[in-house]
Each structure stands twice: as C-alpha cells, then as structure tokens.
Amino acid sequence: MEKLQKILIGAMVFFFLLGAAALVLLLRPEPEAAAAAAQPQQTLTQSLWRYPDNLRLGEALASRTFTTPEGQTTDLSPYLGEERTLCMYWGSWCGYCEKQVELLAPLARKLEDRGVKVLLIDKMDPQKESLEAAKAALSEKEIPFDWIIDSDLSVYRELGMHIIPTTYFLDSTGRVRLCRPGTIGSEAELEAQLDYLKNGGAAGTETFLRRNLLNDEGGVQMHVYESGGAAPGGQDVLAESQGLLMTYAAKTGNRELFRQAYDYAKTHLDQGGLLAWYASGEESGQVNALLDDLRVLKSLNAMGGYTEDVMSRAIAIAAENRDETGNLVDFYSFSDGSRANRLTMCYCDWQALEIIRPLVPGFGDSLAKAEEVLEGAYLGDDFPFYANYYDYETKTYDDGSLNMAEAMLTLLHQAQAGHLKPASLSWLQAQMAGEGIYARYDTQGNVVPGGDYASAAVYAIVGLIAQEVGDDLLLTQAVSRMESFRCFAADSPLNGAFADSLEDVNAFDQCLALVLYAGMNSQDT
C-alpha cells in the first residue's frame, strides 16, 4: 500500500510539473521580431502593436533629419531611388535585421535595375552598438547599401515606432505608400510588396479576384470553391458583391469591368428593375435587398452614361421597397408581392436614396420617415451605434447583438451624408488606437461570446469612414489592420487576397478592400 501511494504521489508530481512546463510555454512572450514575422492573421491584441503609432500613409518622409556615418546632417532626398525606395530601420545587433539585410543584399543589382533603392537607417542604440561596430558589420558582410543614422531616435519616436526591422516603401517623391513592421521573409514577399508600391494596393487584389472569383459571365462568386450545400454558398453570386465590384469599377473609371459586372446583374439577378439578392446557377433568390439595389443605383449614377437605367431602377425601388404608408422596407417578394415589415438601419444609404428624391414625387416624405426611424435607433454616446432594425408592426427596435460589418455600414452612410455623430467617430478613433474592433457586440458595447475576432471587411469600412471625414491617421490604422489579413507572396495563388487559404476566401472582404483602395488612389494619399 505504501509503495502504491509513492507511485501515485510520484505520478501526481510528474503531471503537475508537466502541466507547469506547458503553462510556461504558453505564457512565454515571443521575441518582438519573431512575432513581427508571423503573418497574415493574428489576434486583435497582436495585430498592430508593432505598427508605427503616428505614421500616416502618403506622409512625406524625405525632409526628416538624420546623420551620415561621417557625422554630417542629412535628409532622405539624396538617397531616394528613381522610382521607389525601401527605407529599412535596422541595427547591427538585431538578428532579424541581419536576416533581412542578407535577403536584400544579393538583390541589390536587380532592385537597382527596377529603379528601387535600398537605404538602411540605423536605430543607433549606445547600449547595444557603436558607430564603429555598425561600420564593421556592414563592411564584413559587404552590404552594398547606403546607410544613415537616427542618432537621437527623434524620427523613430516621432513616428511612434515599436520594433526593428521596420521597412518603409517610398514612392519617387519620398511619400510612404506601404509600411511593413517585422522581417520580410522571402523574395516572393518582397516582390509582392514592390508590386504594391508600383501599382497600388488594388492591383494584386483585383488580379486575385479576376483569377479566382470572377466567373466567365462577370459574376463575383462568394467563394473560390463550390460548397455543395444549400444556396447561396460556394460559387453562387450575391447582388451585394456585384454592387461592390461596380462601385470599385466606377471609382477607378474601369468601364469594361463595370459593364461586365452590370451585364451579369441584368442577366442573372434582375427581376423587373430590382435585383434578386443572389443567383445560383439558373435560379435566383425570391426577394431583393434594398441595400443591394441602392448600391447598384449609386454606382450607375457615378459611372455615368446610364441615365435611363438610373431612372428605371430608382422608380422600381420607390415602387416596391415602400409599404402602403410610404415607409422604406428591407425587401420585396417577387413570388407573392409581399413586403418586409421592417427597416434595417444599414440599408439607409442616404446618398443613393437622394438620387431617387427628384425622380419620384413624394419620395422626400419617405426619406424623412426613415431619418426619424434611424435617429430613434441610436443606442447612445457610450456605445454610439444603432439598433439593427425597426419593426413597423410592433413599433420596436431590435435589441439583438450587432454584426459590426453591418453596424459600420450604417456609420459609413451617416458619414457620407455628413451626419456622423462625434461620439461615433471618437469611438472608432479610440478602438483603432487601442486593440481594434471585434466582430460582434451587444447593445451595451460588450463583445459577445464567439464574436471576439476581427475581419478585413470591418477595417475596410472603417477606412471608408476615415476617407469621408478626412482623418488620415484613422485611415492609416484601418488600412494597416486590414492588410494584416492580406497575403503578400508573389509565388502564391493567394497573393493579394485577404484570407489565410483559398478555402477561407470570401468575396465581401476582397470587394470592400478594392473599394477602399480605389478611394485612396483618387485621394492620392
């Protein structure tokens, strides 16, 4: 018996130590640069802590003051490449910096031939290196790049930097077009980033969408692969995605892509001037969604040359997406002519609705009612969002949790109309400066169980809001968080996509990112 007790005690001690060791491994913090190298998807608390706090995309860095190895004061102007410049913050004592320099050094001639110059900026840390040590390290490894020194760390601190290596991709004028904290892991990753720098963020994503989601008839499939489940799913097409692609095409002036997307909508989704909310093969949904039709209407108006289509679709929306008292409603049924008895707040795209006002007598009264309904949906300044929908029959607002993609669309429409509440903007700014935005909250502003994750789409919409209100810092924060989900790998079929794998790709993320990128190009940020 005593022997058995000793065996049991020994086993208990063994498993206790094993559990303690596992706990230590789980809780052990990873080195900064090692965490920086992980990509593309991360938890909210990890996703941006290493991104420079004060950087603004489009910001000119050329005038910042540095020191040459000879002790002379300089700015970046003498070091800019003909077309593009990679400014990499590094330190000779930093192992991850050394790996990145070793990746770039053999590519020096290739980069130079492409008009790309590499400049090393030494984060001089007297406790870890000296000027002589830095010179010796570069000489010993025969590093062919120019280098300068942020000797008092003034620029490092001004930009709110956190780690090295951090690489700034500058255009020919010295403006930041892309920032990548952490190690560039491969030539394929660098190639994708250089393509981004040369052609803009949209190019790689549009290429991915064309290759993997855009079918032969111009429909944007929900996913890359067929699902085999109930419709809609897999390679079915949502009116939502068609409208977003048309929005992107209108913003970029791409008439051929616009025509292709619209032709699909007219052929496979159109039901008497309204769009079925999805198409699955030769079948389509039996109801429309007001927001989908408004998005297409707005894109037709923005593209120009579709006057008759704008008028006919505006009249159809006014006729079918209002009840007998003139209230705007979510959907109209093609099968039995019935209508929804509610209005979802994110369906109130005021810019699109204003297109209808002068075309349909009395439509202004419907807008006034909808504005009153939306104002009543406001949850308060502590959590400055809006209830999901209003039920006309019960005269009550939904008290369910908020899908933040839909909640953000409501704020976007408010911002586009010039009615975004200061409390809403302040909430966005605080969250984006902090741990980010989760996928789902209750009406009190608490994250709901299962909703503690982020999505590229939500951050894309935050970026669109930032564009509307002219907040460059918020825009940069939104883009950088969105791009933490983006694949940068020129040799990967996933390059340019916002997903971890082809199985995880959804059209909503890709299309919203394209719309955001299009707006950034038009603002020349």
PLM feature spans:
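Short, internal strand/loop/helix patches
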Residues: K135-T173
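Extended ligand-binding clefts on enzyme/binding-domain cores
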Residues: A202-F208, P232-E240, G285-L291, T307-Y459, ...
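Thiol-/selenol-based redox modules, centered on thioredoxin-like
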Residues: T173-A203
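Terminal, non-catalytic domain-edge segments
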Residues: P361, A407, H413-L420, E468, ...
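N-terminal carbohydrate-binding/catalytic regions of secreted carbohydrate-active enzymes
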Residues: T205-L291, L428, V458, I465-E468
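Short active-site neighborhood of thiol/selenol oxidoreductases, capturing the structured segment around
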Residues: L76-E98
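Structural microenvironment flanking redox-active thiols in thiol-disulfide oxidoreductases
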Residues: E98-E140, L153-R157
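N-terminal "domain-start" segment that seeds a small globular fold
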Residues: I9, Q39-S77
